[in-house]
Amino acid sequence: MEDGSSLPINTPRNQIILGAPTEKKRDNLRLLGKVTITPFKDLKVIAEYTFNRKSAETTKYDNKFEYANGISNFNKESSIANSKYEITSGATDYTALNIYGNYTKTVGKHDFSAMAGFNQESYTYHEVKSARWDMINDNLPSLSQGTGAYENKEAFSEYRVRGLFYRLNYSFAGKYLFETNGRYDGSSKFPSESRFGFFPSVSAGWRVSEERFMDWSDSFLSNLKLRVSWGNIGNQNVDPYQFVPAMEAFRPNWVVDGSKPTALEPPALVSNSFTWEKVSTLDFGFDLGLFNNRLNMVFDWYRRDTKGMLAPGMELPGVLGAKAPMQNAADLRSKGWEISIDWNDRIGNVSYYLGFNLYDSRTKIMKYDNESQLLGKDADGKLYYREGMDLGEIWGYHTDRLYTEDDFDVNGNLKPGIPKVEGYNPNPGDVLYVDYNNDGLINNGTNTGLDPGDMRIIGNNTRRYQYGIRGGAAWKGLSLSFILQGVGKRDMWIMNELFYPHYDEFSTFYDTQLDYWTPEHTDSYFPRLYQMSKGNTAANTMTQTRYLQNGAYLSIRNITLSYSLPKKWLTPWGAKNLQIFFSGENLFTFDHLPKGLDPERTVTDDLGSRGFTYPYMRQYSFGINLTL
């Protein structure tokens, strides 16, 4: 400093070193109880009770310290204007009661079973937060050792679910199978007039292989069962009190008579008629077993319709100054399929198996009141839906190339006919986008599906063609098994510190980020960089095809090698079994992303998210299983 003293520079590392740590204590209490009564043969009455309390106490101290800002002559600055000590205590109580009866009966070739019961769940959350400013002593912060203002807050939330349920099963000779289920549930999250819903389901199966007319296939057909099912379930995944026009007190920034007054926020618009989402699923499938069940195949095709999806309702005029209330505003449809194939066999003393499964699905919005077809997210970060929209779609710009010096005249101005991002003046090395509407400006129009400007759908972040491969072999006590898992297709938009070079002033440069534009290196992958990510960084990092990543991958989930000692070696020692094993988890992943990015854990976000997530750990295990 100018006075000869020294201070740490304001870096993230020094903020951690000089700042006070946050302490958190957690407790988890869980009680379970179960009673089973058998009044008479074939009938069991079961009562189950669960209580779970999770509590936490967090102590946080924002202490005040001085640092050198490192920008303008290393001026001395304070981390905060006033120190603050804060204690937050909260507890969540969950209780569940289930009382149900099971009845089974067999008469000849007829098998019958029935279940009926009652269910009730309750959830209660209570939190108290107290804070005070200006601590006398940084080493002994407490609410009583402050000289500044107090702040006290309290939060409370609860909801209840109560319902009846049943299940009926019938089969004849193991060939004709029938099942029906149903629930009648009520939730306090919904208005009293629309609190309850009935959710039935039914399924049937036919074991064709057991029919006499299939006797000709006994030499190779072990099992053939056709299945069909349809069912409804209810979804109440919405915050409580959405139908209550509540007001919240707050302290505004203005001062009246020397102090901040207490003000009330006006209540939000509410709906008194929204209710459960109803999710109905239609499924067709078959189970196939061949060659004494050495080869097995299971296939399912399904269509899932969500009716009355809970979402903000129709658009309201901007002059109203309020958001649309929660309503059953949308319908969506998912279609998908899944296939699983397994082979088990033995060759001499070697037994082995190999399995493969593959599934895929897509989801489309079938109905939503969004006449202007707004794109993106609202102020609360919730996605705008629109009719015909595929969930997961990525809107962005098609990248043409990077600007070159030939795109500018001798005065540094763009030549006629070459577009630029609206509001920015490009330089050589910046990103040049495709101007679809030929107006000379790259923009998102009105940011709607009706007028997206130069934006187009450039990808979809839904995981497609997810698959798994498993296999193993055993020979005289020695066995080896493996599990592979992967995704066949996925687009990922990644724009964070781990992907983009010089993300902010304290970013680390990784070796995967060194291919950036310079006047001497014009055929680079990354564009021109700007100090502290200013300049045209925002224009260069708009969602685009150039940096859209391929999220497909194959991961080696597990490899296990084991050896079981012969029983004749163990009998003299009084042991029944001794197995030695070595196992590896999450060993390798083959993907298309830059080094350091995990296709399963990577944060896909715009500039503003640092992108750090904890990856799946690679683990090695060695152990002995002994049975006496």
PLM region descriptions:
Residues 242, 344-461, 501, 511, ...:
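Conserved small-residue
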Residues 3-62, 73-392, 539, 543-628:
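Extracellular/periplasmic, surface-exposed regions of secreted and cell-surface proteins
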Residues 143, 445-448, 536-537:
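Short, positively charged
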Residues 14, 67-70, 187, 426, ...:
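Extracytoplasmic gating/loop element in the C-terminal half of outer-membrane beta-barrel translocons
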Residues 405, 469, 626:
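Aromatic-residue-lined binding/catalytic grooves and analogous aromatic/hydrophobic interfacial grooves
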Residues 460-495:
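Glycine-rich, aromatic-lined ligand/substrate-binding cores of catalytic
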Residues 46, 65, 481-483:
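A structural signal for short, well-ordered beta-strand segments and their strand-loop junctions
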Residues 5, 289, 340, 411, ...:
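Intrinsically disordered, low-complexity regions of eukaryotic proteins
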